[in-house]
Amino acid sequence: MLEVLPIQTKLEQEAICARCGVEFKTDCMAYHALVDGNLTAVCQFTMDAEGGHIHDLAMVRDVDFSDRDRIESLFVMGRATLNFIDLCGVHVAYFEDANFEGEGMIKSIGFTKTPEGRWFVDLTDFFVEPCQHGHGLKRD
């Protein structure tokens, strides 16, 4: 069973980030994904006057996950992060993880690329009908 949960302590966040090969950022909030109780992924994010910012979305390193576990972990965690950002009253978000290699996943979560090359999503009413915002999940 897939679970996406907020990381409760900075010590835990640092350890999870290390397992996922991303830099621990003390100013970030974070979620982690688990499948059947096993850690699969992390998402670090912030919010500021510009909007929400997903800084890292990464799988645990050196573990072979099924496509299903990988796709579901990243997609559900990305959407959960956007939902939290929206519930906090921040209605735009940016995907800022330059090391993430899955453009299809970024689009599926709901982001589109601006003319300036930034991944952006307008969260106004996004979760009224979230399925309309996916751009087709394609395996990279």
Mark where each language-model region is.
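Acyl-donor binding region in acyl/amide transferases
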Residues: 52-117
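Short amphipathic alpha-helix that is part of the acyltransferase structural core
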Residues: 1-25, 130-140
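Short linear motifs at secondary-structure transitions and domain/linker junctions
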Residues: 4-10, 18-20, 27-35, 67-72, ...
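Short glycine-aromatic motifs
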Residues: 2, 28, 110-112
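A conserved beta-strand-loop-helix scaffold within acyl/acetyltransferase catalytic domains
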Residues: 19-60
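Generic preference for well-ordered secondary structure
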Residues: 1-4, 17, 38-41, 77, ...
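Terminal substrate-recognition subdomain of acyl/acetyltransferases
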Residues: 32-46, 94-140
